[in-house]
Amino acid sequence: MATQAVPATAKKRIRKVFGNIHEVVQMPNLIEVQRESYEQFLRSRPADGYVSGLEKTLRSVFPIRDFAGTAELDFVQYELEDPKYDTDECRQRGMTYAAPMRVTLRLIVFEVDPDTETRSVLDIKEQDVYMGDMPLMTENGTFLINGTERVIVSQMHRSPGVLFDHDRGKTHASGKYLFAARVIPYRGSWLDFEFDAKDIVNVRIDRKRKLPVTSLLRALGDAVIEVNPDKGKFEAGDIVAISGVNRACRVKAVAGRLVTVEDPTGAIIPGGLIQTAEGEKIGHVARIRLQGMSGEDILNYFYRTQRFVRGENGWKVPFVAENWRGQKPAFDVVNADTGEVVFPAGTKISPRAANKAGKDGLETLLIPTDQIFGRYSAYDLIDESTGRIYIEAGDEVTPENLEALDKAGFDHVDLLDIDHVSTGPWIRNTLKADKVEDRDHALSEIYRVMRPGEPPTKETAEALFAGLFFDSERYDLSAVGRVKLNMRLELDAEDTVTTLRSEDILAVVKTLVDLKDGKGEIDDIDNLGNRRVRSVGELLENQYRVGLLRMERAVKERMSSVDVSTAMPNDLINAKPAVAAVREFFGSSQLSQFMDQTNPLSEVTHKRRVSALGPGGLTRERAGFEVRDVHPTHYGRICPIETPEGPNIGLINSLASFSRVNKYGFIETPYRKIVDGKVTNEVVYLSAMEEAKHTIAQANAELDSEGRFVEDLISAREAGEFLMAPRDHVTLMDVSPKQLVSVAASLIPFLENDDANRALMGSNMQRQAVPLVRAEAPFVGTGMEETVARDSGAAIAAKRSGIVDQVDATRIVVRATGAVDAGKSGVDIYTLMKFQRSNQSTCINQRPLVKVGDVVNAGDIIADGPSTEFGELALGRNVLVAFMPWNGYNYEDSILISERIVKDDVFTSIHIDEFEVMARDTKLGPEDITRDIPNVGEEALRNLDEAGIVYIGAEVEPGDILCGKITPKGESPMTPEEKLLRAIFGEKASDVRDTSLRLPPGVSGTVVDVRVFNRHGIDKDERAMAIEREEIDRLTKDREDERAILNRANYARLKEMLLGQIATAAPKGIKKGSEINEELLAEVEKREWWKFAVQDDARQADLEAVKAQYDDAVGLIVKKFEDRVEKLQRGDELPPGVLKMVKVFVAVKRKLQPGDKMAGRHGNKGVISRILPQEDMPFLEDGTPVDIVLNPLGVPSRMNVGQIFETHLGWAARGLGKQVTSALEAWREANPDAQAATPPAAVVDRLKEVYGKEYHADIEGRSTDQIVEMAGLLKNGVPMATPVFDGAREADVAEMLRRAGLDESGQVELFDGRTGDQFDRKVTVGYIYMLKLHHLVDDKIHARSIGPYSLVTQQPLGGKAQFGGQRFGEMEVWALQAYGAAYTLQEMLTVKSDDVVGRTKVYEAIVKGDDTFEAGIPESFNVLVKEMRSLGLNVELSSIEDQSDDDDGLAEAAE
């Protein structure tokens, strides 16, 4: 059958995928979180109306006004210029990759009229001010700070908003629940409401002393403003803006000129302007009275009232059916209208009876008088004429005050509807317990709590309270907080209202009281709807705001001390605080981390990490189990598997593979919509809050051809619970089975068969795998390998479609074929990184995958990086494993390996160490980098050039000199004679000492790169010049190649346009008017072609356009080249006092050796115990020795059975690969001339058989060459993919083994390599993907003879980095004491440690060949004596002989 031809760059190797579930949505880019967040911080998009975080921050601080109000500094716009150095230059020079930021500021100077206090503008000045550099993010989502790559980890913190909770009965002895509510702002004071043990509702501000909540409520309330109307009329419900109040207020009531405005907390100024929301003036404030809530207001907000009317023999009350349901009255309930008994005393009223009575027309009941005693009055009942108060709002009705009411002629009372069952008297009790009378009293109480010890005045108390929650400068809920508040309290405020309002506070208290009454649910703090993520942009925005506020204070002071009329914005601004804040954030914040660059996966994971630690977050010590635990809302948002072991477990998490962070900072995960029972391909992203009301089916639910569920009951999730739901209840469906795990966990095949703890170790250890010299993708993968390689930036993808023009090991040149934008080059040059050092000293090396002439499409992988093969992640190698014990060398997870692995460099890796030396300017003179080093023989200098720097390619050993350096020595003052001799005979060699850079112990390798940096204005040495020339040659080659490709493309286009045209102007020697043809053009040099002009005007215009474009492009290429060269020749910016710096890079080849740590992907880790000769290893029937022997006991107890499945499937993959190879070999033998041969039908059939029918079309579409190449790559094994939770089942594995012609048990007969005997039992053998981890024995092994000592204690330092010794600790001392080894113990504690004199003597004795020594006084004794003296205790050491002499002396003196 004819199929579409497969393009040349199509995958050379196909992975056979076992998954059945078709994914409808593409996985978002893995580092999108970082890039998106920083982009939103850095750049505004005026077209979309989006304001960047940076601009918001600047606008929140500006305008800055001086104290007198005579000047104002306003922000206009900001601009980020092009960065000074590109990323590669920053990496080499140790610079920060940042863009200079220019801010346009406007200084407005006012003249203030002293009488009317009106301001008029005197002068306006605008100026661009440089405000430091803003670090830029690289394409891969990292920052280059001082030349090192860093990642800003996102932080998970509590979302602003309101949270309701209780103490779980822990506070009070009775175990009753004490409910609490907390309003958390983004910044500002925290507001806590809580019940105490006496059921009084209290409030705390910023965790200070508690107050009754009614004090806070009395401080709230409305302003009654007397208005001088200008025009227009006020109506209730209007939104108005009042001068001095920094947000809109709602009009509550209007009575003539008195307007009640809701909650305008803030300083309303008499005479202030009142405007409509549209900005139209309405009137001025004449007088103002702020009135707090009265006791009546408070009670009527929280309780319903019931009116009781005096009747004969009792009180009449309206009948409300729901109040009587389930009641058992102790009296006859009588119908007030007819007098008949409706509910007899002592009978329980059923809901049905209550409803029936209502339907039968019962309206009013009569109840006995004693039934209203103990209820509470809703209002103050007062005698209007005398002012006598009979009963206050909230007071209890008693026989006495009821009698007084009777006498005063009250025929009805309004009582609060508190039944002590569904409505409790909590607020009423709080009101009665509260000693505060009115608003002023309440404000002064709040002031006393917030500022204890200061006497409050009315103004200060008012200002403090207004600033706490109602001033947008000091209190900010943020849009998120407002959205959360609206959702929880069912309010409808705009999300721009980011301060609190009275109704917010009232709604919080109302909800809290309802919780106490048993209505509603408390919140779950660990729900992801209540936790949000702060990514880079937001973290930096907060930090920058802090810097700007510091700057604002300085600017205000400067404005009042400088003559503003002559000053420019530049004179007022000092950007240091803002710049320092940014530098501090990137340099030393807990969330700015040194990027884990061990391999591509560790980079991606680091960028997707979410930490609960850091500033404003949790601390390890305080975090309990609940915070660390997996929560149902983590599903699809945060990986339940990948988290560190140890103290950070559960606090540092990884985003799940499909999740993304929305604009409010909540993590969302995608679902497919279900419409009318049919699963659609429409995908919605939902946060944890939005998901709560849905029932969600799993991704593996069975669907029919129309997309409907096959089963009636479906496994689904609803409100965090797993249940079997009827299919018509299901509203959403997961998009993919791997959406609940992170990237690292989704790379583990057969994850579903592993225990969770081991899966955790597996995902963590993949991040520690060292890139090997030869990468090999796994036989058994999961299909995620390509995504990780692409998104991590390790493998290079083509930016534009085009044709490969040139390829060598260091660069790929692609000629773009699509339409080229103006101002852009038509050539893409991809420079490959060759043997560069990563942050973890692993080696970054990229290799091209394309050939000259290949057609590439945008997005195709054109070069492999570290740990990638054919654009797929390749962290380790496939090795042949046998699970069997072998002479105890597998004890405790040890690993026995074959010598072949070492010999063939299977697990060899390259590590690059960087050493640097600086020549400084010292007090005694400058240091010098030179070959002329005192007291060093020629042998030690053999690797140095004339400048004293090691050659590239030199093999170096520990102690070898990498760079010669001499430092001037201090010396005693010289006598005049010495000075004279010095002047005559010149400098002595003895006045300098050797401070050369030498290779430290334990490192030996090859010098791969040397970089020399010189301070500006210092002469460059020969080596620096050579490096510079080399770099300029490389740039010249790039320039010439780019120009050549440009010329080729343009001249071809030009030729096409000129042919067949009539020339109206022509180069020298060509007649005008002649027709332009091939021969004519051949006579003229190409660069002369531009001189042709043609008759056709339209064509002439096109020619001119092409010429202009060509000139621009050439100009761009030349300018780029000149810029680069200028930067190279300019001196380097070095730290102060440094004249010259040399960096030497040494590559070390690390072969596998005993003590290295290895691991599989299932948490099966171990240390190499022995390397066995190949011939001694157990071997298969065909004589193949196995590569690795693992302990079978490592599987059952650890429950990571995935490794066994992997072994079997890997074994089958190898078998199938052999079958394809044998078919290919047979074809090659039959067809020696591959060009003229018939297509390899047998190979194609075999491939179809191996891959299955889904791949037939792809295989048939390939050309003979492609088939041969593809089959050749399957020699080692057929790559397979078993996606997590949707991979190969046991039956599939057995089927693959059968197809490969192997035993379905996966076990084979094995023979002992030493004797040749067969082992008693069959052994499980197969291919496992093993990784070599970064814990290499070479980095850990360490020995010391003599070395550095601590300054105070004089004991040897500790640790490999300090070249320290091994600590002989307390328990080791006990061991020597137990053995009675007194002399050994003595030397351990003295001459081998801190006996300074003794150890010198021992050294001398050893040199002389003497073997006796004497121990002296350890330095630690002297330290102890000094410490005691510092406490005022004079301790002296004297020997016994001295003591006896002194005694005699004393005796004599006494006589």
UniProtKB/Swiss-Prot annotation:
Key word Transferase present: yes
GO cellular component assignments: DNA-directed RNA polymerase complex
MF terms in GO: DNA binding; DNA-directed RNA polymerase activity; ribonucleoside binding
Principal EC category: transferase
Entry-linked Pfam families: RNA_pol_Rpb2_1 (PF04563), RNA_pol_Rpb2_2 (PF04561), RNA_pol_Rpb2_3 (PF04565), RNA_pol_Rpb2_45 (PF10385), RNA_pol_Rpb2_6 (PF00562), RNA_pol_Rpb2_7 (PF04560)
Disulfide bonds: none
EC number, UniProt record: 2.7.7.6
SUPFAM superfamilies in the record: beta and beta-prime subunits of DNA dependent RNA-polymerase
InterPro entries membership: DNA-dir_RNA_pol_bsu_ext_1_sf, DNA-dir_RNA_pol_bsu_external_1, DNA-dir_RNA_pol_su2, DNA-dir_RNAP_su2_dom, DNA-dir_RNAP_su2_hyb_sf, RNA_pol_bsu_bac, RNA_pol_bsu_CS, RNA_pol_bsu_protrusion
Assembly mode: The RNAP catalytic core consists of 2 alpha, 1 beta, 1 beta' and 1 omega subunit. When a sigma factor is associated with the core the holoenzyme is formed, which can initiate transcription.
Family as reported in the entry's similarity comment: Belongs to the RNA polymerase beta chain family.
HAMAP family xrefs: RNApol_bact_RpoB
Protein name as catalogued: DNA-directed RNA polymerase subunit beta
